[in-house]
Amino acid sequence: MPRRRVVAKREALPDPKFGDVTLAKFMNHVMISGKKSVAERIVYGALDVVKTKLNRDPLEVFSEALENIAPLVEVKSRRVGGATYQVPVEVRASRRSALAMRWLVDYSRKRSEKSMPQRLAGELIDASQGKGAAVKKREDVHRMAEANKAFSHFRF
């Protein structure tokens, strides 16, 4: 246990265009090598594409997508007497959103569209409709937790 005091978590500043804190955090996940302006251009471009394709509020689509991607349970490795068990544990709210954002960005980068805003928009639209690679990742994580339910008594 650390002897020092617990450092308070800093709140992210809301993004300049929509004034949304979650979107600002998402931009930080998209950002590579500290290039915030590039990340902003990518995210805002993707939201514009979503707006033209679906004729809906892009922030609504974004929040739906994150909700559909965020995992409720995950497995953690726990070593008990020489054997390693995959123990299902509930995911904290902060980690849920962080994982959802990370998976959304990762699977957007793997898509085949031309530009990053188009890839991100495609993954956002798919995720908001309950399909796409990021949603599949969540289902896989849930399936692993369900398969290892027998080891849930090995709590952390």
UniProtKB/Swiss-Prot annotation:
Keyword RNA-binding: yes
Keyword Transmembrane included in the entry's annotation: no
Pfam families reported for this sequence: Ribosomal_S7
Assigned GO CC terms: small ribosomal subunit
UniProt GO molecular function: rRNA binding; structural constituent of ribosome; tRNA binding
InterPro entries named among the record's database cross-references: Ribosomal_uS7, Ribosomal_uS7_bac/org-type, Ribosomal_uS7_CS, Ribosomal_uS7_dom, Ribosomal_uS7_dom_sf
Gene Ontology process terms (BP): translation
Keyword field: Ribonucleoprotein, Ribosomal protein, RNA-binding, rRNA-binding, tRNA-binding
Quaternary structure note: Part of the 30S ribosomal subunit. Contacts proteins S9 and S11.
Role: One of the primary rRNA binding proteins, it binds directly to 16S rRNA where it nucleates assembly of the head domain of the 30S subunit. Is located at the subunit interface close to the decoding center, probably blocks exit of the E-site tRNA.
Family: Belongs to the universal ribosomal protein uS7 family.
Protein name: Small ribosomal subunit protein uS7
Lineage of the organism: Bacteria, Pseudomonadati, Pseudomonadota, Gammaproteobacteria, Cellvibrionales
Gene name as annotated: rpsG
